[in-house]
From Swiss-Prot:
Active site: D7 (nucleophile)
The protein's name: Phosphoglycolate phosphatase
Binding site for Mg(2+): D7, D9, D167
Source organism per UniProt: Cereibacter sphaeroides (strain ATCC 17025 / ATH 2.4.3) (Rhodobacter sphaeroides)
Keywords recorded for this protein, A-Z: Calvin cycle, Carbohydrate metabolism, Hydrolase, Magnesium, Metal-binding, Photosynthesis
Cellular component GO terms, alphabetical: cytosol
Origin: domain of life: Bacteria
Catalytic activity: 2-phosphoglycolate + H2O = glycolate + phosphate
Pathway the protein acts in: Organic acid metabolism; glycolate biosynthesis; glycolate from 2-phosphoglycolate: step 1/1
Length: 218
């Protein structure tokens, strides 16, 4: 059977509420005003270092390396304490994963979220055992949209045909750069209109995913 690689945030899980809470807890420690959920959701997609850079820039800061590292460490302290307190698996996502797994698909994760937090999220939701490989944002020097992490995840599956499933501009660009067919989840953290993102198929509910992936193999 072929392989499939999934993004995490905005694709399998709605994690923005926990990311939002951790950012605001980190800011509260220095007496700063909180951000709205919509603002933080708009900062998600390129990994924690870029998230923190965007948070600080939105506050009018141009941080040096020390300030950025300090804020990132504070954020991660709060986030890793419980990354699933407010996070939820998208409806139908677990069932789709289990269906694909039962059919013999090999499944990997490629995310810009750090490896440990990604693994903890999958474990907390009882789906870690469905994944054959995880490539997190701190596993390689490169992060998406550089194709290296996706290529590493695909290579770990050792299948001739590998598809990629994601929700954002970053995911679409990564798939295109890696030369993989891309299935776009339309209900995640995308900013641009669907037609602006290169994709080979799209879905709005994970119930549709197994049939879509089979169609992309045809």
């Amino acid at each position: 059977m072929p392989g499939v690689v999934f993004d995490l945030d905005g694709t399998l899980v709605h994690s923005a509420p926990d990311i939002h809470a951790a950012v605001n807890r980190a800011l509260a420690e220095e007496g700063a005003e909180p951000f709205s959920l919509a603002e933080i959701t708009g900062f998600i997609g390129n990994g924690v270092p870029v998230l923190i850079k965007r948070v600080l820039a939105a506050r009018g800061e141009t941080p040096d390396g020390h300030r950025h590292a300090e804020m990132q460490d504070r954020f991660m302290k709060h986030y890793e304490a419980d990354p699933t307190a407010l996070t939820s698996v998208y409806p139908g996502a677990e069932a789709a994963l289990r269906h694909l797994h039962s059919e013999g698909w090999r499944i990997a994760l490629c995310t810009n979220k750090p490896y440990a937090a990604s693994r903890q999220i999958l474990s907390n939701f009882g789906i870690l055992d469905l994944f054959d490989a995880i490539v997190g944002g701190d596993c390689l020097p490169q992060r998406k949209p550089d194709p290296a992490p996706l290529r590493a995840a695909a290579a770990a599956l050792t299948e001739e045909v590998v598809l990629y499933v994601g929700d954002s501009e970053v995911d679409a660009a990564t798939a295109e750069a890696a030369g993989l067919r891309f299935a776009l989840f339309t209900e995640g953290y995308r900013h641009a209109p669907v037609h602006d993102l290169p994709h080979h198929g799209l879905f709005s509910h994970h119930d549709e995913l197994p049939d879509l992936l089979r169609h992309l193999l045809a």
